[in-house]
Amino acid sequence: MTRTPGSGAPMVTAPEVRRLPRFSRTERTLHWVHASAFFVLLGSGLCLYLPSLAQLVGRRPLLKDIHVYTALAWLAALALVVLAGDRRRLLADAHEIDAFDDDDLGWLRRRGNPQGRFNAGQKINTIVTTALAFLFTLTGFFLWYGERNHAFRLQNALVVHDWLMYISFFLVLGHLYLSLVNPSTRHSLSGITRGWVREDWALKHHAKWARALTRQD
């Protein structure tokens, strides 16, 4: 406790907030490469898919080129980040995301079980997002190359591609709500932008991870 200069009134000094390192530079780069490409692909895809938007924007051949070349750049950038970045950290992430324990099942049943670095919802979101990315790439290849070689034209590829877009759209809406709007969870954005989160927040939302990290210190 200190005193305000020029007065006898005591001034309470707020305790220093401890920060816990959450995401590495490689993890953050991978996330933002995927996110930025997704929004370009979603925007150009909607303009190609919705007649009202297609008529408003026009220039359909240019939109198709933007869509295709953004997809190619997205795949190349993801590969570059994985090859040039911290692969050991990414592999550890994959192992943790793929492992579900009793606390994860309890969390899904809203029992408030303590969570690790990724909660059960984040694990499911990552698995679904990865599956969607793979299916988008697969159906997108058949749509693009099928126009050039009819032997690769896959029936219903466009229908599947469109349905993947619907699923992704609503998945991203939920993701944006939790990371930008919901007061309880929006501090998580700090982890993926600045690489750290407050210890008090981590203890509330990822208690097992936070406790393990503080024990290492």
Can you describe what each PLM-predicted range is?
Residues 1-217:
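Membrane-embedded alpha-helical bundles that constitute the cytochrome b-like, heme-associated redox core
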